[in-house]
């Protein structure tokens, strides 16, 4: 998000369709150059947490926790710095996107205090997920 250019936007909502329960310290994801991605209703994307914060194109992200896959209930724009909630809990803020699985899905990288998995957060299929407009990454992690 660029506060000098961007106004308000809708909340992007979805539901978990599959929970993942593992973590890795050598994943090798690469941060895409784009800080925002347009998404469509019905798309499924993977949610991945990391404690790494280096928001530059090509940054390598190794320490990750896999939360699961979300099906989006509406289209919209997901920006770096957006708050990610699952149920009533703030999981973290969007760091960016890894496109290694395109055209199948994006890995949406979420900055969190630690790389948590779906098991760690006791997630379940159908848990509500939301991406709410943040403050352009000024806050690395929502507490």
Each PLM stretch: what is its role?
Residues 2-27, 39-41, 102, 106-143:
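Glycine- and charge-enriched low-complexity intrinsically disordered segments
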Residues 31-33, 38-41, 47-49, 142:
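Long, compositionally biased intrinsically disordered regions
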Residues 50-67, 107:
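Short, basic/aromatic beta-hairpin or loop at an interaction surface
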Residues 67-73:
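Short alpha-helix capping/helix-loop boundary micro-motifs
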Residues 77-79, 84:
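Short, well-ordered loop/turn sites that connect or cap secondary structure elements
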Residues 84-85, 130:
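Hydrophobic beta-strand signal
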Residues 87-88, 133:
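Conserved "cap/hinge" positions at secondary-structure junctions
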Residues 90-100:
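Short beta-strand-centered aromatic/proline hotspots
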